[in-house]
Amino acid sequence: MLEAVSAVMSLGGMALFAGLGLGYAAKKFHVEADPVVEKLEALLPATNCGMCGHPGCGPYAQAITEGEAINLCTPGGKAVMESIAAMLGVSPAAMDDEGPKVAYIDEEACIGCTACIKVCPVDAIVGANKQSHTVIVAECTSCQLCLEPCPTDCITMQPVPENIYDWTWDKPAGPNSKALH
């Protein structure tokens, strides 16, 4: 019994010592993050797809603070770009795409290899091995990571069809608008 108590006490002491060491190291080597970069990263879709030319959303947020264009996030689209512009106090830039798109799988050509399912960062593709797959349109972020691994090229990017639920009124001109003067 005494051996068990001494073993527990020694392990507890080592754990306490390691915890104190880690706590000290966390305080000693703490690096202050740029709050603007953190806010930008929160606005980005976090798919880390690399379509902007950076290895993920964090490096792209850092690049924006260093002067990179704010309109390179294809999955985020116009809404994310406008949010970034509003946060930084700059004018929105034109998006160089034709609008939002989602992946479409030709289910007759799909062989059910699951390669697309494995690379989708948001789990927007459903299906089983050796069964045809389909895309959950509401979840697809248009990152296009599913296109390359598909051995049958049965995945294409299709424009998001407009419907009555997505339609919105144009914002009216405000009292300070040049359109009224």
From Swiss-Prot:
Keywords: 4Fe-4S, Cell inner membrane, Cell membrane, Electron transport, Iron, Iron-sulfur, Membrane, Metal-binding, Repeat, Translocase, Transport. GO terms for molecular function: 4 iron, 4 sulfur cluster binding; electron transfer activity; metal ion binding. It is found in: Cell inner membrane. Its main location: membrane. The keyword Metal-binding applies. InterPro entries: 4Fe-4S_dom, 4Fe4S_Fe-S-bd, 4Fe4S_Fe_S_CS, Elect_transpt_cplx_RnfB/RsxB, RnfB/RsxB_Proteobac, RnfB_subfamily. This is Ion-translocating oxidoreductase complex subunit B. It comes from Magnetococcus marinus (strain ATCC BAA-1437 / JCM 17883 / MC-1). The gene is rnfB.
